[in-house]
Swiss-Prot record:
Sequence similarity: Belongs to the BPG-independent phosphoglycerate mutase family.
Residues reported in the UniProt entry to bind substrate: H123, R153, D154, R185, R191, R261, S262, D263, R264, K335
GO cellular component terms given for this protein: cytosol
Subunit structure of this chain's protein: Monomer.
Cofactor(s) the record lists: Mn(2+)
Protein name from the UniProt record: 2,3-bisphosphoglycerate-independent phosphoglycerate mutase
UniProt binding sites for Mn(2+) 1: D402, H406, H462
The organism of origin for this protein: Thiobacillus denitrificans (strain ATCC 25259 / T1)
Enzyme Commission identifier(s): 5.4.2.12
Gene that encodes it: gpmI
Cofactor remark: Binds 2 manganese ions per subunit.
Length: 513
């Protein structure tokens, strides 16, 4: 089957906001973007809340965005599924969760609960900790240790005190549990193979090994702030009562990992579940009774899963592959899982005719130190792919607006936008020269808001702002006044001249004149 070649460019974290103040996108010098916006059909679409399968008031994120874009329909997120399970009561009868609780209770062992403690809603939610404490109390389990990872990335940089206080109140109300350790997500939730970061979290969890200790979580947080650390970067801290010892994981204990987003939970899970793990030396390898994850983190993991993924049939990648067409996914490390695993509806393997290019992200502590990231390298690979004329569909992600936006550094974020703009001009020109068309969009907002006016702190989280869509091609066309991320794949199919599969509920934003 013949199809017009199309290029989808996803500008990660590129939201729309009119005010220039603290807006890296508005303040950046971006002649290519400005020209494309002025001279080509464009619109704004929704990328948060119910339009992408999230609860009301919940900002979008990269996982959710790419799932919805690739599926061509609203994908109800694990966050929403879990919240509904708590409301319906199913959470408290979930077989995987009950198994972990009962194994600990019936054998006099400890249940260790791991996860990101915040209300950010991107990787986890504090209310899931609270619900699990209720479950443990209902089932008569007395030994529950909470190992909390601090956020400061999808939440304000110094907001952990609120979540720790609410958790402490819940512990008192439920009558079970105590905080045994805490560490920043920078260490516990690395996804870029910085294994020494992960080792510090693993050693803390398994043997209570930590650079710092405190009598309470609140005291540990105050000490971290005094050292100049913000939530994301809090170093391993064991919470040890005056008359006690650090908590360790023992043979026969159970673990429940409460993160519902997989990409930043995989690396820390591996040393617990892989017998031949070799990325770092493990001083202790407790033989756990069960390792339960709230959602499916990887098809390769032999673990218990409380909420397994739901199959997404006939997403864009699968549909294009079944038509015998060629496609390419390209991104740097930070967003590679999003244009592959998440875009494909949670499928680990590539579809027939699907090629993938991974460009390594720079090895820096934070991306404000190198706001260009690997955008230029991605662009060179992308230009070569366009020039090869092999592909009917190319999906490319530029990570800069999101990853540099997360640092809260306005000047660096402006540089990130300007870098992407330079790349955008080159690849759009190349795709048009090839006789193809381009659709540019974003998965959620971020870089358009770099300061929280209420708190005066850097704004490092995503936003709920609308995201842009630009159609660039030689045909005359118009775009709908609004829509949502589910409409992106139907729009691409319209551009390619292909029918839309019945499983896609989104609608094409594009009308050719």
């Amino acid at each position: 089957m013949k199809a017009l070649p199309v290029l989808l460019i996803i500008l990660d974290g590129f939201g729309c906001r009119d005010e220039r103040a603290n807006n890296a996108i508005a303040q950046a010098n971006k002649p290519n973007w400005d020209r494309l916006w002025k001279h080509h059909p464009h619109t704004l679409i929704h990328a948060s809340e119910s339009e992408v399968g999230l609860p009301k008031g919940q900002m979008g994120n990269s996982e959710v965005g790419h799932l919805n874009i690739g599926a061509g329909r609203v994908v109800y997120q694990e966050f929403t599924r879990i919240d509904r399970a708590i409301e319906s009561g199913y959470f408290y009868t979930n077989p995987a969760l009950l198994n972990a609780v009962h194994l600990a209770r019936d054998n006099g062992k400890t249940l260790h609960v791991l996860g990101l403690l915040s209300d950010g809603g991107v990787h986890s939610h504090e209310l899931h900790f609270h619900a699990l404490l209720d479950l443990a109390a209902r089932e008569g389990l007395s030994k529950v240790c909470l190992h909390v990872f601090l956020d400061g990335r999808d939440t304000p940089p110094k907001s952990a005190e609120l979540y720790l206080r609410r958790l402490t109140d819940k512990i008192a109300q439920a009558g079970v549990g105590h905080v045994a350790s805490m560490i920043g997500r920078y260490f516990a939730m690395d996804r870029d193979r910085r294994w020494q970061r992960v080792k510090s979290a693993y050693d803390l969890l398994t043997q209570g090994a930590a650079e710092f200790s405190a009598g309470s979580a609140q005291a540990g947080l105050e000490a971290a702030y005094a050292r100049g650390e913000t939530d994301e970067f809090v170093k391993a801290t064991a919470i040890v009562p005056a008359d006690g010892r650090p908590v360790t994981m023992e043979d026969g204990d159970s673990v429940i990992f409460l993160n519902f987003r997989s990409d930043r939970a995989r690396q820390l899970s591996r040393p617990f579940i892989e017998p031949d793990f070799s990325e770092f030396e493990r001083e202790r390898t407790p033989r756990l009774a069960t390792y339960c994850t709230l959602t499916g983190y990887s098809d390769d993991f032999d673990v218990s899963v409380a909420f397994p993924p739901e199959r997404i049939k006939n997403g864009l990648g699968e549909y294009v592959a079944n038509l015998g067409l060629r496609q390419l996914r390209i991104a740097e490390t930070e967003k590679y899982p999003h244009v592959t695993f998440f875009f494909n509806g949670g499928e680990e393997v590539s579809f027939p005719g699907e090629d993938r290019i991974l460009v390594s992200s720079p090895d820096v502590a934070t991306y404000d130190l190198k706001p260009e990231m690997s955008a230029f390298e991605v662009t060179e690979k992308l230009l070569a792919a366009i020039g090869s004329k092999q592909y009917d569909l190319i999906v490319c992600n530029y990570a800069n607006p999101d990853m540099v936006g997360h640092t809260g550094n306005l000047e660096a974020a402006i540089k990130a936008i300007e870098t992407v703009d330079t790349c955008l001009g080159r690849v759009v020109e190349a795709q048009l020269a090839r006789g193809g068309e381009v659709l540019i969009t974003a998965d959620h907002g971020n870089a358009e808001l770099m300061l929280d006016a209420e708190t005066g702190q850097a704004h490092t989280a995503h936003t709920m702002n609308l995201v842009p869509v630009i159609f660039v091609g030689r045909r005359h066309a118009s775009l709908a006044e609004t829509g949502a991320l589910e409409d992106v794949s139907p729009t691409l199919l319209r551009m390619m001249g292909l029918p839309q599969p019945p499983e896609m509920s989104g609608e094409s934003l594009l009308a050719f004149e």
